[in-house]
Amino acid sequence: MVTLQELYDKIRDKVQDAPVYRGAINDWWGNGVGSTPYAVKHYKEAVRLNHICDRLEEKTGVHNAELVKAYGDNSLLYAEHTWGHSATVTNPYDTMVTNLDMRKNSYASKAHEAAAMRKNEQCHLLGDILRYYNLSGKVKAVSTSHEKRVFPVEFYVETMSLPAVKVTDDKTNEVMEVQLSTHPRGVLVSFLAEFEPMEEKTFTYEEQPASVQTLFTRTAWVGAERVRDIINTYDTESYKLPYGMENDSFKISWKVGEGITSFYNKKAEVEMCKPGLETFFTPVYECTKIRKGVYEERRLIGRNIRGLHAEQYQGDLKDVRILDHGPVFTKVELVFDLEGTYYSSVIIKMYNKLPKIEFSYHIAKTLSEDIESVFMPLALNLPDAEVSIQNGGVAMRPGIDQLPGTNMEYYLADEGLIYRTKDQTILVLSLIHI
């Protein structure tokens, strides 16, 4: 018996011309990560917090080796453990199995705790008090980017009511365009600001009286029942929101009963929405019924984690809810009927003055012992684009930089994917990393 390194030493001269492939192998583990979205989301936020702290240390010069080690040890243990002791298939209700699952998730939680404590320490060194109860005060925003750019800035005030607020850049005296929205612990204050590389900015915020609503506008823009469905020149956006949203870069259109009908790139003048099960912003449920016993059925599904008798269902758009609409962003919830779920919705947040869209998927899953998958398609209709995903710590091109003959049904993207054309680059960044 030899180690892999010893084997390579023996065959080194014979494999000089062997092809080199980059990225992780698409296999059961790539699929398994998606089976535990809550724990993975918790773990990946710990990874992001750790990267942020690395940047903040460049400013503070303080390095907490104990917390770094606690994060590193626990994140490694979580990432190394596989998604499934064999007994999770044959004996999912066994106490040993549930204990192993909780123990595994605890590694993610310990890693997150260490990273969060490290971030709190770094923020405290930069002057943060961590909690904001005052209706007027100062906040500091720190860019962790090495590039100059405009970023969304958000902070919340723990209060029952904040009718309006004025935010001023202390350095330039610029009054920022602000949007207030609800937050689980109070009021969220959002605005856009430009930062130099790694710049710190201080802003003063002051409570303001509620703005006076003018009733007589000489324009019919809202009905007596307070529904804003009248085409007018006074409010040129509200009556469009039940059917779509747009900014200078993108336009998204939908229709109840039909779903997403358009995802248009206004800069490139390209329709990016693909038809069928690849439609963007639209969840897909897939189910392989257990017919021959759970262990045998899972053996037969192979690398694609899909039985030959698998059925696929696409979400059916049933409702549209306008959650937020203001000078900084618009947020809309699209509610879908989807097989295998009690509740299924996609929340889209579009910034008015940034070429940026944020979206999240909310799901309440039904319980089943069948083999199931829920997908959010990230495919765009850009046939001339080169597609790359961050996989295994390196960038790889699906179908090109991978072992010949391996599956192409799904990919594990560490940080998302990039569509690159000669004129534009579109980044789809996955925060949950499924």
Predicted segment positions?
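Structural alpha-beta junctions
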Residues: 1-2, 160-162, 384
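Short secondary-structure boundary/capping segments
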Residues: 15-17, 156-158, 375-380
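Active-site and substrate-binding clefts of carbohydrate-active enzymes
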Residues: 1-131, 140, 144, 190-196, ...
